[in-house]
Amino acid sequence: MSPLPENKPLRMVANQLVQVARQDIAAETPLFSIPRNTIICAATSTLRDRIPAVFDLERDDAGLSDFEDEDDLTSSSQDSWTLLILVLIYEYLRGDASPWKPYLDVLPSTFDTPMFWSPAELSELQASAVVAKVGKEDADRMIASKILSVVRAHEDVFFPRATDTLDDTQLLELAHRMGSAIMAYAFDLEKDDETDEANEDDEWVEDRAGKTMLGMVPMADILNADAEFNAHINHGEDALTATTLRAIKAGEEILNYYGPLSSAELLRRYGYVTATHSRYDVVELPWELVEMELRERVVGRTEPSDWERIDQLARSDEDFEESIVLERWSEDPDSAGQLGSAAVFTGLPDELAEQFKGFLKAAKKVANIELAVHALADKDMRKDLYLQVVLGALQTRERQYSTSLEDDERLLDKGGLTGRQEMAVWVRRGEKQLLREAQLWVRREAHEMRNKASERGGPDDGPAAKKRRL
């Protein structure tokens, strides 16, 4: 089954403007070039000179106190993300004094990323894991700790005229706006073909993990992006240059590339979805659903306290995952930005099978559960049990969505939805499609097992046979 509804050329772009070629353009043609000194970033804004201590990322602790953790949202330390938010706020508040005022004036004031959705709009995403990743409360805490605290400590820098001071609510709103603009439009300011030696004294590239400098690049962010694309931003020594990857005919849109992102992640980061990105859709399968299916097969034979110990032992493995990501196999775009064969679901992740086996070992060790003992001793039985359990978990995961795949396809075909509703339906529909493909794959695997057992001529009445009705 195709992962996309037939005759559904969905494409909801991040920008209202679509950049099209006015005439035929040959491959490898430079479209425009942006000098690095015109990029808005920590290296070009005067804010760095006004509050240099805030921009000092060279120390090992990056400004952390002895009691602060680098991952603590309440930490006052800065990173490339928060520094750029501070820079944009500073330049925005400067008004006419900022050399980037014309650019800042055309940045969107509203965004379609789920961060700005109402509770009713978010509910349209149903059971998609992206809902938990919106993180507005976390963002509010980060802004209060790393943005508002800096602005309040340096009000003479951000508000040279006391009459222009913003209250905390206004600052929070402005910080969210700038943070969303960064997520949608910012570039990592690395250079192509960079080497360690070349970067030792390079102000554009931070050598600490997660500290690559971010910048807003006027012109470069006018290009929309898709999974199939025809242009690329080359990072040169002195400039960023947009270049065509293949011939573009007059009237065709010029498209950049943001990476192999799922529909949900594309929506979360950039506030739009496209049909071609559906090939990269993923579904998170919570481990608790797998465990629940396994427990149902030994109900009444094990004490609840035993299950708690089994669960604790299984989770003590350093590689234990709370959720397993399911995805299709998809080849990378070629050098011209084009996609080849269709994306295909080719199997369950190896880590799911390993975690399942680890749980059986824990069940054997803690309570000597007969089913676990037999499954560990018989590879075919273990695979059969594994497929049964995973199929049940996949079916339960699909039922967590309040509408069916068919319901969503009818909604998309019928039309009449708001933009945000349609994007939400598209995201949840793609995840259900992937769940269906995974279930089909499991059933085929189970069918092949039965056929092989039949070909061997052995009686199908062993311990696993009683559970093989998939």
Q: Predicted segment positions?
A:
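Short peripheral tails and domain-boundary helices/loops at the edges of structured domains
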Residues: 49-92, 270-299
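Internal, well-ordered alpha/beta segment that forms a basic, Gly-enriched binding/recognition surface
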Residues: 69-121
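Long, positively charged leader/targeting segments at protein N-termini
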Residues: 1-38, 43-46, 98, 102-470
